[in-house]
Design a protein with these regions (language model features):
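Mature catalytic core of soluble alpha/beta enzymes
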Residues: 2-12, 16-346, 351
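Cytosolic catalytic cores of cyclic-nucleotide second-messenger enzymes
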Residues: 354
Length: 354
């Protein structure tokens, strides 16, 4: 009897093993390339290239990714209200009045911004909303007027008065209560240097958690790669030519001097050609140097390649406001970060490579 049981057990185990081998050897479905474009988040164009087993899977993934982007866009908005949403605009409206209870996605973004303030010596300062708001208003006025002759600039006195309300220490975060309070009633937050990049990073991580294994997500100047292509090759990123927006550098003699190959990396670019207005024939762009309160004048563009889109977004802005030597020192202190700056006179030569 014992021998019979042993033989039956062995046969059963063999059957189970055979079944598991058959299941394990089942070929993977071939992944197909799909693309989609969104126009309704972060005031820019979002394009996604992804490889999925079916169009149904792709559509499900993209619907979730799109909804995530919309949510982050609404949370980080400083200009618009949304039904049932407490956002950065709400925080600004309550400056000097009362703490505002906020979503965890705001708290974590603000914490990153404070860390980057320390890391960059204040070159990233989301508390500069009062100064950036002045530049925004002048740029908006210029965009509404077809004649450049009527465009004007803020005065130094106007900017310096606003700069008295940019102390990052007046940003009070209570993580336990999940509240944010601006103790200076004249202070306001502007998260343009961190919000989009951080949102892209979080959205891509969420997509990976849902099973997306191969994708390239582009949100304006923020590019984030998820995994590799199905054949194991890396994604290739491009950098917009600051002097010809229709041209994108991707070849071996481009910005980085070699193909910008990406796998689970972020490629972010900031430039003086993205948002600007013209006064007396001179461009005044949107990246404001905290030291001068005027548009930074070191470069035409800065590109950063690193594993985190939120950090890359912050670093492009910070490096844009630093002289070359200072920027090199910062980049060399960071693991896994590559950066390059470029100007009209020295295109692609003032690199900050590690």
């Amino acid at each position: 009897m014992k021998s019979r049981i042993t033989r039956m057990t062995a046969a059963l185990l063999a059957a189970v093993l055979s079944l598991s081998l058959l299941v394990g050897c089942k070929p993977k479905k071939e992944l197909t390339r799909y693309t989609t474009i969104f126009y309704d988040v972060f005031d820019t164009v979002t394009q996604v290239i992804a490889y999925c087993e079916s169009e149904e899977e792709f559509n499900t993934q993209m619907q979730a990714l799109h909804q995530d982007l919309i949510a982050y866009n609404q949370l980080y908005d400083i200009y618009n209200d949304y039904d049932g949403v407490v956002n950065v605009k709400t925080i600004n409206e309550n400056a000097g009045k009362a703490p505002v209870q906020v979503d965890d996605r705001i708290l974590s973004m603000l914490e990153l911004a404070r860390q980057m303030y320390e890391l960059t010596g204040g070159k990233i300062n989301i508390a500069m909303g009062s100064v950036l708001g002045i530049w925004h208003d002048y740029r908006e006025a210029a965009e509404k007027d077809a004649s450049e002759a009527d465009n004007t600039l803020p005065t130094q006195e106007e900017l310096e008065a606003a700069a008295q309300h940019c102390d990052i220490n007046d940003l009070v975060i209570d993580e336990k209560a999940k509240t944010v309070y601006l103790s200076d009633p004249e202070m306001s937050l502007d998260v343009g240097s961190v919000g989009k990049g951080y949102a892209v990073e979080m959205v891509c991580r969420a997509a990976e958690a849902r099973g997306l294994t191969s994708a390239l997500v582009s949100v304006g100047g923020n590019l984030r790669a998820i995994g590799t292509k199905p054949d194991g090759s890396q994604w290739t990123g491009g950098v917009e030519n600051p002097w010809n927006a229709s041209e994108v550098y991707t070849n071996t003699n481009s910005i980085f001097g070699s193909p910008i190959n990406m796998s689970d990396l972020a490629l972010v670019t900031s430039g003086d050609y993205q948002r600007y207005f013209v006064v007396d024939g001179k461009r005044y762009h949107h990246i404001i140097d905290p030291d001068t309160l005027w548009p930074a004048a070191y470069y035409n563009g800065v590109t950063v390649l690193c594993p985190d889109s939120g950090m890359a977004d912050c670093l492009t802005t910070a490096l844009f406001c630093m002289p070359l030597e200072e920027g090199q020192k910062l980049v060399e202190s960071l693991d896994g970060v590559e950066a390059v700056s470029y100007t009209h006179l020295r295109a692609h030569e003032t690199s900050l490579h590690l």
